[in-house]
Swiss-Prot record:
This is Glutamyl-tRNA(Gln) amidotransferase subunit A. GO terms for cellular component: glutamyl-tRNA(Gln) amidotransferase complex. It comes from Rhodopseudomonas palustris (strain BisB18). InterPro entries: Amidase, Amidase_CS, Amidase_dom, AS_sf, GatA. Keywords: ATP-binding, Ligase, Nucleotide-binding, Protein biosynthesis. It catalyses: L-glutamyl-tRNA(Gln) + L-glutamine + ATP + H2O = L-glutaminyl-tRNA(Gln) + L-glutamate + ADP + phosphate + H(+). It comes from the Bacteria. Its EC number is 6.3.5.7. Coiled coil: none annotated. GO terms for biological process: translation. The keyword Transferase does not apply. The keyword Nucleus does not apply.
Length: 492
């Protein structure tokens, strides 16, 4: 039998339908792969008993011809999604052994469609990070290595566990979240596909909040088709989320393979940043050439406020985080560190419960919202955000179907290599991705090549609001031209 962990999600779905193997066999293969790859630290909680139980139930449904769109397919869930009866910590000590009595909307829709839970995936603490090094469970290791080196690399963040697990063949797909690039950057670092849908496309209910006006759930998978299949199950209106949009969910998979002839693809001049490696520039041109060869028209566009996006993002996101994280105080749930009085208990709990990066962002957020600085920082950042959104609107109004950019300014870097002395060095990793969140647009990262050391590099496509279908069509063109990327399993 084929190695079941090497299958794409679409291939596994078709194999189950053809009864080539059972969901239990598929699930057991992935559970064994997870056990063998613990050195990657991708999973923070494994749920083998629950997985096998769900797989058996799926097999019974498939036998009766009653299977859902994801029936029997084993997935990993980022530890930001509440899973009823299964520990959910956001990879923070402050949530300790918190076990929610409720299910997030996104995961409940995955279970509704028949998916199998393999366990919870590592992420940066409260999704704050670009390398998955801030987790209280320790850093995640990228399954990719530089040629001729055994140095451990980061998988990107904050959804590093999701990207690492998918790239290593530990699950067929994974949920992730994206506040400033946390789906697309890890996907680019690991040779996987990640899509951040339009803001409001997937419900945020039951997902631990970082920055509520920026957070959006999406999938990380091995192929564009797999991402499309997963997004269809994850998306949909939810009355429990006031920012959820009541709009029909299309058949995203049908867009994969659709012709892109005649589409206008914008190439934004502002994304040619100083110091960008020649390899990234060459990859960007290669991607544009592939789309042109498929019949698309390339046009240079201007997004003049791009240069202000990163500083504005690092004002807006911490401001929202400082408000959202005020609820963690040791009173009702999570960790509690006692003190001589209630105020000291709050202080002790938060000081010991939150990690250094989370504390830094809470402090930045509190500072920019304080009386003397609100107008100078937060209000200005929100005005910049409006201008960034307007840049995209004007671009799309000229008939541009999508915008092509690099996904990251570099390939994956070493664990402990960046941000130690200067956190801004780490924040610069988000330079190509934050504009998408600030404008609430959909963006997809697709593997497009490798650097001189053999590490995967990705390209990003940015779409019009609620036009994820065009991104899947264009993404598949790049995927077909570039081929698929698979990491060698050095950990076995």
């Amino acid at each position: 039998m084929t190695d079941l962990t090497s299958l794409t999600l679409a291939e596994a779905r078709d194999g189950l339908a053809a009864k080539s193997f059972s969901s239990l066999q598929l699930t057991d293969a992935h559970l064994a792969a997870i056990e063998a790859a613990r050195v990657l630290n991708a999973f923070v909680l494994e749920t083998p008993d629950q997985a096998r139980s769900m797989a058996k139930a799926a097999d019974a449904k498939i036998a009766k011809g009653e299977g859902g769109p994801l029936e029997g397919l084993p997935l990993g869930i980022k530890d930001l999604f509440a899973t009823s009866g299964v520990r959910t910590t956001a990879c923070s000590k402050i949530l300790d052994d918190f076990t929610p009595p409720y299910e997030s909307t996104v995961t409940s829709q995955l279970w509704r469609d028949g998916a199998v839970l393999l366990g919870k995936l590592n992420n940066d603490e409260f999704a704050m990070g670009s390398s998955n090094e801030t987790s209280c469970f320790g850093p995640v290791v990228n399954p990719w290595r530089r040629e001729g080196s055994d140095a451990k690399l980061v998988p990107g963040g904050s959804s590093g566990g999701s990207a690492s697990a998918v790239a290593a063949g530990l699950c067929l797909g994974a949920t992730a979240t994206d506040t400033g690039g946390s789906i697309r950057q890890p996907a680019a670092f690991t040779g996987t596909v990640g899509i951040k849908p339009t803001y409001g496309r997937c419900s945020r209910w039951g997902i631990v909040a970082f920055a509520s006006s920026l957070d959006q759930a999406g999938p990380i998978a091995r192929t564009v088709r797999d991402s499309a299949i997963l997004l269809r199950s994850m998306a949909g209106y939810d009355a429990k989320d006031t920012t959820s949009v009541d709009r029909a969910v299309p058949d995203y998979e049908a867009a994969v393979g659709r012709s892109v002839k005649g589409m206008k693809i914008g190439i934004p001049k502002e994304y040619r940043i100083g110091g960008m490696p020649a390899e990234i520039e060459a990859l960007w041109k290669q991607g544009a050439d592939w789309l042109k060869a498929a019949g698309a028209e390339l046009v240079e566009v201007s997004l003049p406020h791009t240069k202000y996006a990163l500083p504005a993002y690092y004002i807006v996101a911490p401001a929202e985080a400082s408000s959202n994280l005020a609820r963690y105080d040791g009173v009702r749930y999570g960790a509690r560190v006692n003190g001589r009085n209630i105020t000291e208990m709050y202080e002790n709990t938060r000081a010991q419960g939150f990690g250094a990066e989370v504390i830094r962002r809470i402090m930045i957020g509190t500072y920019v919202l304080s009386a003397g600085y609100y107008d100078a920082y937060y209000l200005r950042a929100q005005k910049v955000r409006t201008l960034i959104k307007r840049d995209f609107e004007e671009c799309f109004a000229k008939g541009v179907s999508a915008i092509l950019t690099p996904a990251t300014p570099s390939a994956a870097f070493g664990i402990g290599e960046k941000g130690g002395a200067d956190p801004v060095e780490m924040y610069l990793n988000d330079i190509f991705t934050v504009t998408v969140n600030m404008a609430g647009l959909p963006g997809i990262a697709v593997p497009a090549g490798r650097d001189s050391q053999g590490l995967p590099l990705g390209l990003q496509l940015i779409g019009r609001p609620f036009d994820e279908e065009t991104l899947f069509s264009l993404g598949e063109v790049i995927e077909q031209a570039a081929g698929r990327f698979t990491a060698a399993k050095w950990w076995i």
